[in-house]
Regions:
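Flexible internal linker/loop segments at domain or repeat junctions
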Residues: 181, 185, 217, 222-226
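Short amphipathic alpha-helix that is part of the acyltransferase structural core
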Residues: 1-43, 48-50, 73, 148-190
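Oxyanion-binding "anion nests"
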Residues: 179, 183-207
């Protein structure tokens, strides 16, 4: 049976993560981080495969915005050995259950392997790169579809003004259209949840101005916290 999870399912979900991902997974070590990422009142933004009272699969999701037809992203996808025996496509069916149950305009799969493209196409899904600003200290590790408009981090010929954003109110001074010209669309609630109120991850945000063009560059500080 497929259903949407509640907060009461947290212990069973963490057990599944420990068994099928790693017993020392960050969500297993820090259940408060798990709740920050997935809890919404007494619900969890997770769908589960349940059989005889046992949770045998999970598919997590999050909201990029809270419009009437929001963009959502998928994360934390597990299908147990038992679930695969019942149905080799149990994981795919669970993901499709989420897409049927959660109203949305666009579904994104951050970190999806290019090798899975044929699977999505088999199920008549449209494959397109997510238009994020992606940066790396190693150019060889950058994906082919990397899109940094006007390449602000590569010293464009235009005069480039860079300033660090230290307060959430400064985000509101950016041209809001920059969040609507890319997919997925991010709203202020997402930016606050992800980058400013997040007590578990540390980010640096930079405003880049080239002429009349505003850009937002986000850098995650690694190896701090969980």
């Amino acid at each position: 049976m497929f259903r949407l999870a509640t907060l009461n399912d947290k212990p069973a979900i963490l057990q599944l993560i420990a068994k099928y991902i790693h017993p020392n997974h960050v969500y297993v070590r820090r259940s408060d981080l798990f709740e920050y990422d997935f809890a919404c009142a007494d619900k969890l933004n997770i769908a589960v495969i349940e059989h005889d009272g046992s949770i045998e699969g999970i598919f997590g999701y999050f909201f990029y915005n809270y419009s009437l037809e929001p963009d959502i992203g998928g994360m934390l996808w597990i299908s147990s050995d038992r679930a695969q025996k019942w149905s080799p496509l149990a994981g795919i069916q669970l993901r499709d259950f989420v897409l049927r149950s959660v109203k949305h305009r666009c579904f994104g799969a951050p970190g999806a392997n290019v090798k899975t493209k044929i699977i999505y196409e088999t199920f008549k899904k449209r494959w397109m790169p997510m238009e994020h600003f992606v940066c790396s200290l190693r150019p060889s590790s950058m994906p082919d579809f990397l899109k940094i408009r006007l390449e602000p981090l590569r010293m464009p010929k235009n005069i480039c003004y860079v300033s660090q954003i230290r307060d959430f109110d400064e985000i509101k001074t950016l041209d809001p259209d920059i969040f609507y010209f890319q997919c997925p669309i991010k709203d202020l609630a997402y930016l606050c949840w992800r980058y400013f109120d997040n007590p578990f991850r540390e980010y640096l945000l930079w405003r880049v101005d080239i002429g009349k063009t505003n850009m937002l560059v986000v850098i995650r500080i690694q190896n701090r916290g969980p």
